[in-house]
Amino acid sequence: EMSPEEQDKLMAQLQVQRHVKGIDELGIPRFRITNGPVGVGMGDGHPSPPATALPMTIGLAAGFDPELAREYGDIIGSETATLGQHVLEGPGVCLHRTPIAGRNFEYFSEDPYLSGVMGVEVTKAIQAHDVIAMGKHYAVNDQEYERFRTSVELDEHVLRELYLLPFEMLVKDGDIAAMMSAYNRVRGVYATESRYLLNDILRDEWGFQGYVQSDFWSCRSAAASLNAGMDHEMPDAKWLNETNVKNALQDTSLEIQTVDRALVRRYTQMFRFN
């Protein structure tokens, strides 16, 4: 059984590197995470081993060829596994909404269905190599400008028909193992604290069985994030640290079962993918 201190060590990654330290005494291994949607970009050592720099996914989607997307994902999954990594932060299935958006190169299309089809094939191919694929950035993170402060205001029809559809396809058709929450707010609530997005829709409605990781420094709270369904903070324990979690447990804004649940979700996927 883990102590509260041991639980806290596993709630966030090791500073600087994309690794979550294991606990040898409990037989829990180090957990290695790498970026990204257009090829393995390890960023967890200097120098990092080389990997293939693949063409932009917008070019991949322009071929309208699911089989090509599967080959694309096969390269990423194979190299991720060969380099000893456990999680690949991708595919990205946000939509193109402006031609100068900073991450258009790693998203597929302005069309949600095409984005979903291509993302599903990439996901299946990555996970065929016993690598956890992580869909991002959930949700409505379709611009980089002011992404830390923007609140996206949209009605339910638009939210579901356009912005959530690719993520829904990743879950239902791709059986994706992890999801990355976004920086922005949706209807005034930060994505990392949105019970509606992370729990009501993602898990209760779509049946997602994996875990949710924050984007780098997108987490803004301990209790609110964990209660909403966010499971893992990146890249360090700014919020999910021993002090904050202990205080939240003491003031009853957080229950220990919620902490347990966050860890179980992640380690269930670790065991699933060996």
Regions found by a protein language model. Give the residues of each.
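Glycoside hydrolase catalytic-domain context in secreted enzymes
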Residues: 1-274
